[in-house]
């Protein structure tokens, strides 16, 4: 399964805080841990691009600062989300072990706030170094030995996290037949609840070789299985919501790190699962951005 960072227990957190003289009364992590959980609320992040050096600037952006601001926003929500998904490109460039140590360190406040974090891989990640750096935190057993895949069951939907990393620093992605077979079998075994598929890479086309190479094979699996309601991805560093002709929602998450085109928003999405759909609330890091607070209401296909 993808690296799963469980919440840090309240006891662990209090002990760590006391040892570090953290000032419990003012701690946003403790404040978040004391809140009720929104069982249907989820934080959707992509492309955090963290580097070992917290002062590193890329495209005019400090990536560590951006994730820190998102983390603080999550901790200050009226109700804490049930969990956080980070849909690939966790590392800055080539997925070094020290990058993933920084990732683990930066995600600790979220875990202290009692929110589990699910991490998937993108083309700027390195699977082996990822596993090595986070060895103590990951689940002991994965459904596929050499891929980061998971099924996360929740009250109103099942989340399927896939691994589209083909080669580090190679832009396109690939799922491969073994992973597609696992997805098909897992969907068939879980027919009676909406399914949401999370993959780092965007749907690819002949004209767009930078996306998912086996997009058509993926759609051959998910289109006829009517419980699949959405395909959620990052990679393009663009915020966009579209719909496949079959009715599957295509949700392109904004980057937490930097944008490729001036004017695009950086930030995250607060997703709220409803009985027959999902509400998406865009949270821009630049709160003056015209898209900040944009709400998209999705209705599930029948």
Label each PLM-derived region with a short phrase.
Residues 1-7, 12-32:
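N-terminal export signals
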Residues 34, 96-184, 189, 194, ...:
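Extended active-site neighborhood of metal-dependent phosphoesterases/phosphodiesterases
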Residues 45-46, 84-88, 117-122, 162, ...:
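Active-site neighborhood of phospho(di)ester-bond hydrolases with catalytic His/Asp-centered motifs
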Residues 48-51, 90-93, 123-127, 165-168, ...:
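Solvent-exposed loop/turn segments at secondary-structure junctions
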Residues 18, 53, 95-96, 128-129, ...:
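Short N-terminal helix/helix-N-cap motif within the alpha/beta-hydrolase-1
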Residues 36, 272-302:
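A short C-terminal boundary segment appended to hydrolase-like catalytic domains
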Residues 32-100, 192:
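N-terminal active-site segment of His-dependent metallophosphoesterases
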Residues 190-206:
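Short acidic, glycine-rich surface-loop motifs adjacent to enzyme active sites
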């Amino acid at each position: 399964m993808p690296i799963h960072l469980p919440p840090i227990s309240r006891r662990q957190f209090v002990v760590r805080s006391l040892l570090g003289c953290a000032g419990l009364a003012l701690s946003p992590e403790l404040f978040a841990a004391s809140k009720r959980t929104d069982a249907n609320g989820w934080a959707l992040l992509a492309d955090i691009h963290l580097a070992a050096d917290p002062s590193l600037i890329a495209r005019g952006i400090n990536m560590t600062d951006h994730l820190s601001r998102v983390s603080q926003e999550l901790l200050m929500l009226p109700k804490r989300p049930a969990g956080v998904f980070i849909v690939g490109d966790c590392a800055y460039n080539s997925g070094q072990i020290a990058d993933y140590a920084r990732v683990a360190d930066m995600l600790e406040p979220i875990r202290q706030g009692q929110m589990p974090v699910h991490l998937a891989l993108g083309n700027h990640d390195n699977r082996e170094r990822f596993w090595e750096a986070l060895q103590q935190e990951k689940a002991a057993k994965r459904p596929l030995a050499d891929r980061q895949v998971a099924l996360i069951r929740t009250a109103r939907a099942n989340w399927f996290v896939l691994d589209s990393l083909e080669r580090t620093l190679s832009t396109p992605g690939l799922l491969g037949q073994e992973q597609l077979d696992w997805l098909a079998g897992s969907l068939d075994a879980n027919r009676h609840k909406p399914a949401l598929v999370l993959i780092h890479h965007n749907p690819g086309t002949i004209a767009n070789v930078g996306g998912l190479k086996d997009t058509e094979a993926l759609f051959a699996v998910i289109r006829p299985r009517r419980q699949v309601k959405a395909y959620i991805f990052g990679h393009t560093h663009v915020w966009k919501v579209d719909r496949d002709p079959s009715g599957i929602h295509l949700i392109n998450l904004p980057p937490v790190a930097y944008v490729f085109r001036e004017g695009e928003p950086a930030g995250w999405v607060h997703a709220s699962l409803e009985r027959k759909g999902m509400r998406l609330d865009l949270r821009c890091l630049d709160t003056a951005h015209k898209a900040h607070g944009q709400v998209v209401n999705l209705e599930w296909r029948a």
